[in-house]
């Protein structure tokens, strides 16, 4: 017993004096401090729930899907644009289109009106042989004046009428000055309005002569012939007055129209309306037929022919001049023959012009035929009567 107790006590003493294993920590070690804090932070952060983890994964996939969709739309747009460019329209052979010629314009600004009486009622007359026609204008009527190929002479031949050709080469429809001033603007004495005044009164005879004197050698060769014709013709015997000026006003950049003053003579349409107004007031039994300019080419800075629907000279394109002239004639109830779209147009101009402006013989004949068409438009109506009875 004693021995057992003795051995038991000895073993307890051994355990009491047994020194455990210890780790020595260096408190000045920075790595240890950082690892300690990081471990604390990791342990303090809550771990994501399974739902949150699934949501994050779904959000990433959604963003990826949107980008893919946008990329696909962009690529499809590019493909569509390329396809449209390559397949735009249908290639057409112009030679095939015009193999039978350029065709005819079916839409024109023609306004064919009969003469009207004091009550505004139409008077249909038969303009056959014995009809008297007085013509104003410039190159279309003045070129080759003494030739059978002259436009006025062609009309005389086609109608059997007596034609007084008072056109003046190199003249314009629009005046350069609102008042007659032969010293500074001598060519103004030849425009339509002042020629009408010359034919109806004696108060500008001296101004006309002075204009011719100022021009000297540059005066139109027919100037004094026109003067004497207008002073001697009896307007009471005239049945038709015809007015035709070419595109010279457009090419010179002359003013076109005025909304404030319809009879402003420095305007292309105003000068025409002023002359028409004068005729209708003093000679209401005269039918007025206005022939528009035919097509003419514009000329660019290089001297090249260009479309007159593109080239402007201060105001507008040629077609606008013609359309404004049509509106003026409609407002005055006079006949308007649209030569720009109905006679000589951009498609066939090369066949009827000798240059960018002047008519060849075929062109004059075509214009003459259009005039005769307008002159006799109402002849088959059954209501026509002799021009002698209308005077």
Residue ranges and their predicted role:
Residues 139-143, 256-266, 311-315, 352-359:
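Second-shell loop/turn segments in exported
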Residues 293-391:
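Catalytic His-Asp segment of secreted/periplasmic serine-dependent ester chemistry enzymes
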Residues 132-137, 162-167, 239-244, 287-292, ...:
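Structural recognition of the beta-strand scaffold that forms the well-ordered cores
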Residues 2-164, 378-391:
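N-terminal secretory targeting modules
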Residues 124-125, 221-236, 280-282, 377-384:
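Surface-exposed acidic, glycine-flexible loop patches that form ligand/cofactor-binding
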Residues 242-256, 276-316:
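Active-site segments of SGNH/GDSL-like serine hydrolases
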Residues 142-254:
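Conserved SGNH/GDSL esterase-like catalytic core that processes O-acyl groups on lipids
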Residues 272-276, 322:
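Generic structural signal for well-ordered alpha-helices
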């Amino acid at each position: 017993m004693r021995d057992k107790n003795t051995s038991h006590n000895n073993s307890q003493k051994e355990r009491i004096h047994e020194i455990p294993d210890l780790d020595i920590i260096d408190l000045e070690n920075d790595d240890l401090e950082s690892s300690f804090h990081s471990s604390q932070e990791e342990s303090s952060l809550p771990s994501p729930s399974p739902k949150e983890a699934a949501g994050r994964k779904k959000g990433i996939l959604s963003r990826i899907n949107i980008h893919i969709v946008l990329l696909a739309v962009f690529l499809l747009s590019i493909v569509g644009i390329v396809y449209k460019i390559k397949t735009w329209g249908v290639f057409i052979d112009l030679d095939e289109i015009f193999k039978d010629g350029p065709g005819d314009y079916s839409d024109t600004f023609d306004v064919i009106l009969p003469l009207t009486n004091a009550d505004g009622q139409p008077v249909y007359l038969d303009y056959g042989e014995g009809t008297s026609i007085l013509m104003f204008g410039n190159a279309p009527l003045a070129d080759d004046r003494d030739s059978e190929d002259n436009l006025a002479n062609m009309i005389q031949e086609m109608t059997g009428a007596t034609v007084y050709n008072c056109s003046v080469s190199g003249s314009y429809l629009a005046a350069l000055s609102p008042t007659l001033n032969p010293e500074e603007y001598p060519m103004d004495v030849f425009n339509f309005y002042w020629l009408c005044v010359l034919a109806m009164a004696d108060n500008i005879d001296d101004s006309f002569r002075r204009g011719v004197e100022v021009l000297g050698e540059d005066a139109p060769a027919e100037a004094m012939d026109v003067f004497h014709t207008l002073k001697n013709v009896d307007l009471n015997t005239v049945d038709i007055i015809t007015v035709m000026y070419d595109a010279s006003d457009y090419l010179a950049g002359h003013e076109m129209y005025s909304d404030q003053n319809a009879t402003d003579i420095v305007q292309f349409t105003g000068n025409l309306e002023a002359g028409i107004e004068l005729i209708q007031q003093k000679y209401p039994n005269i039918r007025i037929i206005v022939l528009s300019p035919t097509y003419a080419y514009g000329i660019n800075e290089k001297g090249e022919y260009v479309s007159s629907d593109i080239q402007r000279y201060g105001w507008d394109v040629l077609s606008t001049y013609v359309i404004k002239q049509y509106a003026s004639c409609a407002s005055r109830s006079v006949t308007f023959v649209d030569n720009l779209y109905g006679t000589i147009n951009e498609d066939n101009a090369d066949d009827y012009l000798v240059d960018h402006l002047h008519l060849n013989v075929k062109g004059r004949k075509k214009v003459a035929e259009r005039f005769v068409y307008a002159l006799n438009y109402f002849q088959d109506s059954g209501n026509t009567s002799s021009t002698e009875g209308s005077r």
